[in-house]
Amino acid sequence: MTAILERRESTSLWGRFCNWVTSTENRLYIGWFGVLMIPTLLTATSVFIIAFIAAPPVDIDGIREPVSGSLLYGNNIISGAIIPTSAAIGLHFYPIWEAASVDEWLYNGGPYELIVLHFLLGVRCYMGREWELSFRLGMRPWIAVAYSAPVAAATAVFLIYPIGQGSFSDGMPLGISGTFNFMIVFQAEHNILMHPFHMLGVAGVFGGSLFSAMHGSLVTSSLIRETTENESANEGYRFGQEEETYNIVAAHGYFGRLIFQYASFNNSRSLHFFLAAWPVIGIWFTSLGISTMAFNLNGFNFNQSVVDSQGRVINTWADIINRANLGMEVMHERNAHNFPLDLAAVEAPSTIG
């Protein structure tokens, strides 16, 4: 009898670390993207929580009128926010060591830049980690592609828009009321409701909700009975079972008769691709719209476009929206400038007799 002894090479510490990082057997997959994702998202989350609770007021407009955003300075969950970095800083990279003191850094809104830049890097790494895990499991890469839509939207409002406007102070505040303020000011300055890419985004989000509800209700209504009346229908499914849990033919027949035949998918794969692609493409377009409006390529302007035979303006909904935009623009940053840009651009009449 012959015994064969294998000599096992001792794995280095670095090799063991690499194997652990890339192992799909871990309870939570780390991955090389995760090595960067974990510290960046932890940093963004930690600073956000601390600043939301205790950050002092920030001179957002750069005019020595600080705006309070934290809970300890009089706000609640609804009104609180991380106030964007001061207009006095503009687009400058503003880490703590660039300020003369921590107090100055806080006064100029340094935490906003820190949170946003770490957050954007972190969510990109999360997207890369989705692709990495899919690759290692032999899956197709579409999960990461779908996640690129919210990543693009976050990038548009937190990075591209400030770059186009010339200051991080124009970025979206990190809070509920701050988000609404950002939306109102964006409409006032860029007429986003009249931009076709925003319209596509609305169709994507609301259409995606509708299709999700339609699909879920159709599947739930055409489950194959596996239980009695006294049991939950959910008990009729076992994780990993090979047979279908619902009758797609019945669902197809129902919906085809409810609308018309070709409104109903007869292929489960193309149906689920459609459910993923519709909202993703819509949000891509909205992100692209924000990114173009960042550089002042704004929504359609149909103001005073309808006149009668005497040249008198016949007001349309476009004119109503324009009046609302002017009102919103007058009210925001009211101490930073006396007139909205649209009014300030008009040449003043001569007062010389």
Swiss-Prot record:
InterPro entries to which the protein is assigned, alphabetical: D1/D2, Photo_II_D1/D2_sf, Photo_RC_L/M, Photo_RC_L/M_CS, PSII_D1
EC number(s) per entry: 1.10.3.9
GO BP annotations listed: photosynthetic electron transport in photosystem II; response to herbicide
GO cellular component: chloroplast thylakoid membrane; photosystem II
Localization per Swiss-Prot or TrEMBL: Plastid, Chloroplast thylakoid membrane
Site feature: Tyrosine radical intermediate: 161
Binding-site residues, Fe cation: 215, 272
Keywords: Acetylation, Calcium, Chlorophyll, Chloroplast, Chromophore, Electron transport, Herbicide resistance, Iron, Magnesium, Manganese, Membrane, Metal-binding, Oxidoreductase, Phosphoprotein, Photosynthesis, Photosystem II, Plastid, Thylakoid, Transmembrane, Transmembrane helix, Transport
UniProt-annotated binding residues for pheophytin a: 126
Name listed for the protein in its UniProt record: Photosystem II protein D1
Name of encoding gene: psbA
